[in-house]
């Protein structure tokens, strides 16, 4: 889990989850630990902000063991590259997440809806 700090100083805890319907909302990249041998065996793209999530989905599709620890492992301040409010940047994030996370790992085209919904929520909720 990860403690998220908003710009106004308030916090909330974002819980990590494993569900049948995968979404980046359930994964907390700052709290992910991966064995070096997996990085060597499955090198990932490393060219965009969603490539680590693509790696996570690849590990899941390869039936690698994923463990969720019910404990806060990091504190995180919101407002990074994935939250930049720019329509062009949002369209690129939608395209990249869909292409390099979901489609490359064999997920349904329906995941485009999830990608659009995430970016729309960022614009609306801040």
Which stretches of residues belong to each language-model region?
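Conserved nucleotide-sugar donor-binding catalytic segment
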Residues: 1-87
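Alpha-helical elements of Rossmann-like donor-binding domains used by nucleotide-donor carbohydrate transfer enzymes
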Residues: 54-58, 96-99, 119
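A transmembrane-helix-recognition feature enriched in membrane-embedded lipid enzymes
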Residues: 102-126
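Catalytic core of nucleotide-sugar-dependent glycosyltransferases
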Residues: 76, 85-110
């Amino acid at each position: 889990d990860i403690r998220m700090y908003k710009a106004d100083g308030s916090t909330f805890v974002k819980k990590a989850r494993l569900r049948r319907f995968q979404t980046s909302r359930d994964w907390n990249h700052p709290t992910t630990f991966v064995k070096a041998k997996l990085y060597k065996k499955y090198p990932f793209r490393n060219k965009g902000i969603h490539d680590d999530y693509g790696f996570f989905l690849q590990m899941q599709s390869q039936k690698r063991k994923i463990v969720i620890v019910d404990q806060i492992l990091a504190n995180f301040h919101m407002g990074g590259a994935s939250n930049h409010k720019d329509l062009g940047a949002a369209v690129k994030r939608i395209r990249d997440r869909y292409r390099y996370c979901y489609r490359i790992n064999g997920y349904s085209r329906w995941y485009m809806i999830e990608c659009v919904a995430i970016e729309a929520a960022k614009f609306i909720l801040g």
